[in-house]
């Protein structure tokens, strides 16, 4: 009996000792999660490293995986089904996936779970239109970087709100802040006079708008969305994976 209790105590102690180590390994696995699957060899190792780092950092802030897949061919499978199969096998939770099929020169962007709500068909169309010219010019790194940045930005704006709205632009907010500040200063001088301690920046909303859930300024490069006529075979293409997960989508040629 004593031997049994001795073994039981040993097992319990071993479990408590191993738990912190298992937690560390889980964190490491999360940090090392792959986000770029360049099967078509469109990127250099350095470019892959930069995209992995950007995706991991911005993805952690939005609790969303930003995935990039390039393939020489989908072997006859529709690109939307190809993307859905990937999510069924490897995806979990909120995920955005950009897939490039080099044989058919086709691009597809999909949003799953929370990303399906925040990256709806309309927002994905806007993102795809913005990166289309870079894809056509074989500037793949720039296109993928912009996809991550715009997806990150749109994931911070409540569903149903147009992310291209003029109120979200920094220059409009600056002009509005200066105008409001100028009016306030004029009123104060007219009624009271004295030392002026108010300026335009006093009234500028640094968080852009109350419709934004989370907004920080990690993105260092200025990303401008481009409006271009849609190709005849492009547009919204949401659906459901074979595994039963619904998604938003946008597809087109480049």
Swiss-Prot record:
Source organism: Bacillus subtilis (strain 168)
InterPro entries, alphabetized: TPM_dom (IPR007621)
Signal peptide span: 1-29
Family: Belongs to the UPF0603 family.
Membrane topology field: Single-pass type I membrane protein
Superkingdom of source: Bacteria
Ranges of biased composition (kind: Polar residues): 243-254
Composition-biased stretches (Basic and acidic residues): 223-235
Name of the featured protein: UPF0603 protein YdjH
Alphabetical UniProt keywords: Cell membrane, Membrane, Signal, Transmembrane, Transmembrane helix
Localization, UniProt: Cell membrane
Phosphoprotein recorded as keyword: no
Span list, region Disordered: 223-254
One annotated Gene Ontology cellular component of this protein: plasma membrane
Protein's gene: ydjH
Pfam families, per database record: TPM_phosphatase
Transmembrane segments: 166-186
